[in-house]
Amino acid sequence: AAKRDATLARLHPTTSLEAAGRADFVVEAITENFEAKRELFKRLDSICRPEVILASNTSSIPITRMAASTKRPDRFIGMHFFNPVPVMPLVEITKGRDTSEETVATTVELSKSLGKTPITSLDYPGFIVNRMFVPFVNEAIHALMQGIGTREDIDQGAKLGLHHPMGPLELADYVGLDTHLYICDVLYEGLHDPKFAAPPLLRQLVEAGHYGRKSGRGFYRYAPDGSRIADR
């Protein structure tokens, strides 16, 4: 309890972006949308001190493309934390075309100081993890569409057969089906590989406003507290 209270005492929530001017390192974690991130980084670039590193928690948007919206591409980097962040030890650090080695080293050390295990990747569509993860989830959705298995059996198969802590469908609900769809589109646009194309069922669910846990409905149904509701 004492450790928790000490940690909370160091947090200073604010709705003012100007507060970032006092930061030594900035990590952006807004919605997965390039235009929104680009506008935010343009503002942060003018607010933060010149030596401050700007990092994005993006899981799919090119780092070099976002860095171009700032005057510090050498101090711009990808720093993706995985859901659920409190229990997932991995941080994927992605180097843009102009990211300096000093920026990479600082970000690696910061990740370690947070108790995370960092890996580094180059700035290519999907980086490392989503290059593997997106086709996996897409295949699970195709299996559901084709009636090969129920959503429960597909998720149980991944958990017990592949030793995954969450099944692909429940994890997609957790991440957000709209987010997964956006990542599919980014990867398909960048790589033109059909395995990254969004399954029709995924697109249909998103168009219906079923985004997963945050909307109360995705592949499963959820209560306001995020707990799953059993189908009647």
Q: What do the predicted segments below correspond to?
A:
Residues 1-54, 61-62:
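Rossmann-like NAD(P)-binding element
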Residues 2, 53-123, 127-131:
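Rossmann-fold dinucleotide-binding core
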Residues 9-10, 50-51, 73-76, 152-153:
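Short acidic capping loops at alpha-helix termini that bridge into adjacent secondary structure
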Residues 102-105, 112-123, 142-146, 151-232:
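NAD(P)-dependent Rossmann-like dehydrogenase/reductase catalytic/cofactor-binding core
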Residues 131, 135-139, 160:
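Short, residue-level hotspots on alpha-helical faces of the histone-fold
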